[in-house]
From Swiss-Prot:
Tissues expressing this chain: Widely expressed. Expressed in CD4-positive T cells.
Composition-biased stretches (Basic and acidic residues): 139-160
Disease implication from the record: Short stature, oligodontia, dysmorphic facies, and motor delay: An autosomal recessive disorder with phenotypic variability. The main clinical features include endosteal hyperostosis, short stature, oligodontia, mild facial dysmorphisms, and delayed motor development. Some patients show progeroid features.
Protein name: DNA-directed RNA polymerase III subunit RPC7-like
GO biological process: transcription by RNA polymerase III
Protein function: DNA-dependent RNA polymerase catalyzes the transcription of DNA into RNA using the four ribonucleoside triphosphates as substrates. Specific peripheric component of RNA polymerase III which synthesizes small RNAs, such as 5S rRNA and tRNAs.
CC per GO annotation: cytosol; nucleoplasm; nucleus; RNA polymerase III complex
The keyword Protein biosynthesis is annotated on this UniProt entry: no
Record note on quaternary structure: Component of the RNA polymerase III (Pol III) complex consisting of 17 subunits. Pol III exists as two alternative complexes defined by the mutually exclusive incorporation of subunit POLR3G/RPC7alpha or POLR3GL/RPC7beta. Found in a trimeric complex with POLR3C/RPC3 and POLR3F/RPC6. Directly interacts with POLR3C.
Keywords: Disease variant, Dwarfism, Nucleus
Amino acid sequence: MASRGGGRGRGRGQLTFNVEAVGIGKGDALPPPTLQPSPLFPPLEFRPVPLPSGEEGEYVLALKQELRGAMRQLPYFIRPAVPKRDVERYSDKYQMSGPIDNAIDWNPDWRRLPRELKIRVRKLQKERITILLPKRPPKTTEDKEETIQKLETLEKKEEEVTSEEDEEKEEEEEKEEEEEEEYDEEEHEEETDYIMSYFDNGEDFGGDSDDNMDEAIY
């Protein structure tokens, strides 16, 4: 005969794991479900070793902080971009970003670097200041007469100077002409001396005595 329950689930359900291993005894009610999130950091079972204190550790820490600050000030340090606004403005195009400003502040020894890498900074042109000069009063008739007299005196002085220069030039030209004439006369005398021949070949010597000679001379 089959059992009354027939093995079809009419009996009490059994747990698949041992409840006593979790810390719950027989007959104890299960704890209610927790509706709060779990803690972010569970309690530490093992605490870290305390940091070594002393002059050497403080010196190394100061060097590390100094190196970190120097690296952030270099031009190739990438900084986070500034978040853009929802509404773009016209002036935002002409505002320079942070890394470019930092690169301009960097002043290395350019004698060791090629000229092509040197950064050219545009200098702002200074606004021209217009200076208003006081207006000159209009010239009167007396001032005009004085200026005319000054001009006349200057013209007379110029004429005197030009006349003296002309006289000096004429004297120099006369001297040059006289020197040229003397030189031409000397050349003419030398030429006539060369033209006149003073050479005697002796053909006319003894012309009268040839008639009285009986024998021929070879």
